[in-house]
Amino acid sequence: MDNKFLKKIIAQSPEDLQIISACCSEAKVKISDIKYLPSNKIFLLSLLRIDREDENNKNSIKSVIKFEFIDSSKSKNIIQNNQNILLELLAIDIFKRNNKFEITLLFSKNRFITLKTEVIEVTLEDQKLEND
């Protein structure tokens, strides 16, 4: 019997965020599944990622990445009018500038979203295993 379980990874440092980035590399994201809630300072990203933790298995996992304490969000080369466009998440990068962190979500075709925050508080939470 396979031990299948859903993961929850919490990142509070740049090193932790690199683990989430590696887990979500090549994940598929619909524009309609990207939400920024400025009054709550939360940025949500629902995605379909490959189960990289199990090398014998290539199941997809429906997951959500939650970024908290986000002061602002900017996107480039993403047409937000067409909600059905499918993006491919390549990596999540971070660097510090003027006592604030800039978290950049890098997508294929030179598309990206930049989030600004004072603290790193990111959660990757699996919702459902696909192809069971």
Annotate each predicted stretch with a short phrase.
Residues M1-D132:
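Surface-exposed, interaction-prone regions used to assemble/regulate multi-protein complexes
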